[in-house]
UniProtKB/Swiss-Prot annotation:
This is Small ribosomal subunit protein bS21. GO terms for biological process: translation. GO terms for cellular component: ribonucleoprotein complex; ribosome. Gene3D superfamilies: Ribosomal protein S8. GO terms for molecular function: structural constituent of ribosome. NCBIfam families: S21p. The keyword Membrane does not apply. InterPro entries: Ribosomal_bS21, Ribosomal_bS21_CS, Ribosomal_bS21_sf. Keywords: Ribonucleoprotein, Ribosomal protein. The lineage of its organism: Bacteria, Pseudomonadati, Pseudomonadota, Gammaproteobacteria, Chromatiales.
Length: 71
């Protein structure tokens, strides 16, 4: 859990904004949303496999675009 020390004479809104930013960088909200409901192990594997396919397709499309620019 990220924590932020409030500096002297620092407005509450500024400290809250810094805390929100650190939570965003740490991925707290995405983790909470992901763990909100139970996910079956098969669903986890399917999600990871789909993400891997998506990454591979993105990598291939970037490679093809790079090759086209070279000629």
């Amino acid at each position: 859990m990220p924590h932020v020390r409030v500096k002297e004479n620092e407005p509450f809104e500024v400290a809250l904004r810094r805390f929100k930013r650190t939570c965003e960088k740490a991925g707290v909200l995405t983790e909470v949303r992901r763990r909100e409901f139970y996910e079956k192990p098969t669903e986890i594997r399917k999600r990871k496999a789909a993400a891997a396919v998506k990454r591979q397709a993105k990598r291939v499309s970037k490679e093809v675009a790079r090759r086209e620019r070279l000629y």
